[in-house]
Amino acid sequence: MSTYPLVKFAFEVDWGGTKVGFQEVSGLNLEVGVIEYRHGASPDFSKMKMPGLTVNGNVTFKRGTFKSDNDFYAWFQTIHLNTVERRSITISLLDENGEPAVTWKVKNAFPVKLLSSDLKAEGNEVAIETLEIAHEGLTIENN
């Protein structure tokens, strides 16, 4: 076991065979819905609870906007052409040697929201684009 916990600023994203740099990745959550049930003859004054279906929340990616890089928009446009391109995406948290320590694998992802950077005449920051994806499952592996 390591002496120190992993830092969260060292990560890489495999975007369908291509490694892409991102400023931030969020939404790597696992959640299960809860089913509540109570029958009329129950002596308890509360509902019984049991696990239900898995809820797959969306994952959000943020990165700088680059000249001649229209990948997010091109992928988003496949929705409007009725030929949605689904991708498998792998996010890896890296250890001190740059090797994957924890890996999240996102299955059958497709874009649902694309946000361009806000523009400010007096701004002093990098233009950031944001892509939100829906998916059909997330697994976590400790390497």
Region annotations inferred by a language model:
Residues 1-143:
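Glycine-rich, low-complexity intrinsically disordered segments
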